Amino acid sequence: MSPRQFLIPNYPWSRVAQYLRQLGTEEIKPYTIDFCNVTVTYKHTSHNESINVSIWAPKPDDWNRRILALGGGGYAATFDHLYQTTAVGKGFVAIGTDSGHSSGMTSAFDTSWALDADGNSNTHLIEDWGFRTLGEMSVIGKHIVEEYYNRLPDYVYFTGCSGGGRQGLVLAQRYPKAFDGILAAAPAINLETFIPAAYWPTQVMRDFNVYPASCEIEAFTTAAIQRCDALDGDEDGYLDARVLSFRSFEADWQRVFL
């Protein structure tokens, strides 16, 4: 195990604030944060992986005595600095693990790490990503916090969406005492069914050698909005899934496409 630590003063939050505004998730003025950046690198006995746990600890006077572990998305176990910056700005110690392979939004759909040099399934690394390193992240994060602040946190939370939501459910199932609260949003579970389902429309188009033009896709969307927009009592261009009653065979497609 190899820990490294750096004091990061006046880290700019402006780029993160700009990104969150683009997502429409939060409207906050840019500011800077001061924190201690600790990275713990380790591997498992008889294995060659390199696992990194990142801990961003705010100054003692700024700490809210809570840890917030941040999940990733897709096949990336964490999104690195993006949400850690936000968490520290709100007073949390932010922690995350890369599970032994590339992390960040640009790595969300990278699966090259799941195969070994011979093209076989890298079972140990897949298990690292699937569950093992998540519990280890909790243990390492709490230990670093106790060493840095000379006390344990009052509460430890986890939050994640999609792939991060899956991580949250795994933590609740396998490590139920690791966190005091888990927010598992839109969990990407049942991989063996939902991933083939996501690719199925593409496969059907390949089988029939028919690929709808973008204007045709837009026509389907327009027809659905025209039929269902007013059902929720507000014609605003958005559909409420709870009241949808659109049936494709009822649309006048000849009028739509001509």
Q: What is the meaning of each model-derived region?
A:
Residues W63-I67, K90-V93, R151-V156, K177-G181:
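Loop/turn elements at helix/coil->beta-strand transitions in domains of secreted/extracellular proteins
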Residues M1-R65, H81-L82, D234-L239, S248-F257:
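Catalytic-loop region of hydrolases
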Residues V170-A172, K177-L258:
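A catalytic-pocket lid/entrance helix-loop region that shapes and gates access to the active site
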Residues T159-G164, G168:
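Gly/Ala-rich beta-loop-alpha elbow adjacent to hydrolase catalytic centers
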Residues K43-T45, G72-A76:
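Active-site glycine-rich loops that stabilize anionic/oxyanionic intermediates
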